[in-house]
UniProtKB/Swiss-Prot annotation:
Highest taxon listed in the record's lineage: Bacteria
Keyword annotations from UniProtKB, A to Z: Cell cycle, Cell division, Chromosome partition, Cytoplasm
Pfam families reported for this sequence: SMC_ScpB
Native species: Clostridium botulinum (strain 657 / Type Ba4)
Broad class of the protein's primary localization: cytoplasm
The protein's role, per its UniProt record: Participates in chromosomal partition during cell division. May act via the formation of a condensin-like complex containing Smc and ScpA that pull DNA away from mid-cell into both cell halves.
Name by which UniProt lists this protein: Segregation and condensation protein B
Record's subcellular location: Cytoplasm
Family: Belongs to the ScpB family.
Keyword Cytoplasm: yes
CC terms in the record's Gene Ontology section: cytoplasm
Subunit structure: Homodimer. Homodimerization may be required to stabilize the binding of ScpA to the Smc head domains. Component of a cohesin-like complex composed of ScpA, ScpB and the Smc homodimer, in which ScpA and ScpB bind to the head domain of Smc. The presence of the three proteins is required for the association of the complex with DNA.
Lineage of producing organism: Bacteria, Bacillati, Bacillota, Clostridia, Eubacteriales
GO biological processes: cell division; chromosome separation; DNA replication
Length: 193
């Protein structure tokens, strides 16, 4: 084999390696969850050892202080995660996005639950004047409210209350830290006048 041919093979190998790394990075980014190394090997149609080797190279390339992400490998699964030192900024973004993702109905429902908890869906519907099923479902899915028992009346309706996630979401130490409703109403009426 001549020297030019060997150099071309080496270039092709580096190019293929970089392509695999690019694909792995895309898969990890889009997944958001750990991906089994075996599954990556299947997707890439290559051996698990090769994927592990590529992952280790990628992991080392993310080590620099100027990088905001890193590769986490645990129990033969791999995930792209943010570096712990950036967590405060990531949390700010997530709080902003969650607030933006709550509909007006969900925010109204959440306010009622926060101030009147524990409260039933029927009581929420009466206060709002419309059904709140979808808003309650959304808040349950986001773990901002929870079922916290049943009312001891016929039919035993579910009681809803806020979660620890609710407190974190609004930066509160406890449920008692919620602004006083009467004070808010007085302030609101002053602003309207």
């Amino acid at each position: 084999m001549n020297k030019d041919h060997e150099e071309q093979l080496e270039i092709n190998e580096v190019s293929q390696k970089n392509k695999y790394k690019s694909i792995i990075e895309s898969l990890l980014f889009m997944s958001g969850e750990p991906i089994n190394i075996k599954d990556l090997a299947t997707i890439l149609n290559c051996k698990q050892d090769k994927v592990s080797s590529l992952l280790n190279e990628m992991k080392n390339s993310y080590v620099g202080k100027d990088r905001g992400i890193k590769i986490l490998i645990h129990n033969r699964a791999v995930q792209l995660v943010t570096k712990p030192e950036n967590s405060i900024y990531v949390e700010k973004l997530l709080k902003t996005n969650v607030r933006q993702s709550l509909s007006q109905a969900a925010l109204e429902t959440l306010s009622i639950i926060a101030y009147k908890q524990p409260i039933t869906r029927v009581a929420i519907d009466e206060i709002r004047g419309v059904k709140s099923d979808r808003a309650i479902y959304t808040l349950l899915e986001k773990n901002i409210i929870k079922e916290c028992g049943r009312l001891d009346v016929p039919g035993k309706p579910i009681l809803y209350g806020t979660t620890e996630e609710f407190l974190k979401f609004f930066g509160l130490d406890s449920i008692e830290a919620i602004p006083n409703l009467e004070d808010l109403l007085k302030e609101f009426s002053k602003e309207e006048n």
